[in-house]
Amino acid sequence: MSFTDDHDHAACQRPLERVRPFDAAAFERAVADMLTASGIAIDPIHTGKTAQRVRELWQKRLLDGYDTVPAEALGSGFADERRDMVVIRSLAVHGMCPHHLLPFRGVAHVAYLPGGRLHGFGRIARMVDAISHRYTYQEWITHEIARTLVEHGEARGAACLIEAEQLCLLMGENRRGDERVITQCYAGDFETDAEARNQFLRAIER
């Protein structure tokens, strides 16, 4: 997997945390200013409600992950002695690249090896949303999903593979438009158990 220079963020592993509350009024003013700076007049027919619409989309769908702690979204699950691998294929996932403020979207394949607790599938999906609906990178999301299942979900191991379309890549110069980025992370027993990794990869094959 290769990235442009803009994706040279391997040395920085800290999430981009929110340092103050979302300011809806300031956000709408910024969108209106961007339209004006682009040379576009704000008129009642086409752009009069654009600032409000953009703010609602960003606040409610693109950045709503900041309103939820991933571990709380996952919850504690329930006690269960089963140890067989649990795999969820093709969870919708999207995030916002902080470099160009362009979204990326794709699917996340998630697996975990229970360590005494099972977790609801909806809970896992909400955890993925809490992790990804932020200013973030695909690599960080992949790592954080696996890490959260092990550290907070008490899983013996966890795996995550994400395949996504990165608009900052797709819209670059001389691109074909069908590029995809694949990232994967293995935590806990998955790191040392090659058979578990292979079983996971077989399970998510289309």
Swiss-Prot record:
Residues reported in the UniProt entry to bind Zn(2+): 97, 100, 168
Keywords assigned by UniProt, alphabetized: GTP-binding, Hydrolase, Metal-binding, Nucleotide-binding, One-carbon metabolism, Zinc
GO biological process entries: one-carbon metabolic process; tetrahydrobiopterin biosynthetic process; tetrahydrofolate biosynthetic process
EC class name: hydrolase
Subunit relationships: Toroid-shaped homodecamer, composed of two pentamers of five dimers.
HAMAP family: FolE
Family: Belongs to the GTP cyclohydrolase I family.
PANTHER family: GTP CYCLOHYDROLASE 1, GTP CYCLOHYDROLASE I
Protein name: GTP cyclohydrolase 1
Species of origin: Chromobacterium violaceum (strain ATCC 12472 / DSM 30191 / JCM 1249 / CCUG 213 / NBRC 12614 / NCIMB 9131 / NCTC 9757 / MK)
Gene field: folE
